[in-house]
Amino acid sequence: IIGLELGQVYSTLGTDVSVVEYMPSLIPGADDDIAKPLIRKLKKHFKSIMLSSKVTNVDVGFKEGVRVSIESNNEIKDQVYDKVLVSIGRKPNTNLLSLENTDIKIDSKGFIIVDDYQKTSVKGVYAIGDIAGNPMLAHKATHEGKVAAEVCSGLPAAMDSKAIPSVVYTDPEVAWVGLTEKEAKDKGIEYELGDFPWAASGKAMILNASQGKTKVLFDPETKKVLGGGVVGPSA
């Protein structure tokens, strides 16, 4: 996602951008119909998009630029670029916290292990934010801080990771939260769907955002919202 966000910025500034994505889709976490308007626009912005592909080698000493070896369809080809932006994820910097001098437990990836109340393995010690595990999002860290503070104060609070919204700051913006329609189908969960195409909205037409849409999944009996997605300005 970071690669798409920054890639679109560079593309808008006039740079030819090629994207190499290991997964078979650019935004695997969102439903296809929510991601489709963005992907349609990115195909116009970017010089090329290589899905189900991976970078196997980068030669920064190549005199004509940066030579990148890309594997796709069991075939490796070399491409030469001026610059390479690596945006395959982040890792926690818990190695700088001297946790080996404490009884605080971390997982195999270096994240501090916490429960739904942000409690660590040491009584009275809480962890929030990027060091407490994925997703590494600012709004997730903020809410974790609130949960930890309320638990410390003796108030009933807990973290519900399913309620963490995901956001893609591209043009158009994409956001989704809770259960996606694909997840509901895969898990056999019954749902009803509220689907609103922005082409029916006068304001969306004024904003030149008629390709946007909003969808909400809800329980057919209780009418409880199970999830939702939006694509368009201010999603």
Residue positions per predicted region:
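Rossmann-like dinucleotide-binding cores of NAD(P)H-dependent redox enzymes
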Residues: I2-E75, P135-T142, E150-E183
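Short loop/edge segments at beta-strand edges and connector loops
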Residues: L51-S53, S108, D195
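Short loop/turn motifs at secondary-structure junctions and domain boundaries
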Residues: F62, L96, D103-K105, I206-G212
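Short acidic-glycine loop/turn motifs at beta-strand connectors
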Residues: F62, S108, P220-T222
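FAD-site-proximal beta/loop scaffold in flavoenzymes
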Residues: D78-V151
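A short alpha-helix-loop-beta-strand transition element characteristic
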Residues: K105-D107, L155-A163, I189-G194
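Flexible, glycine-rich terminal cap/loop adjacent to redox cofactors
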Residues: S153, T170-A235
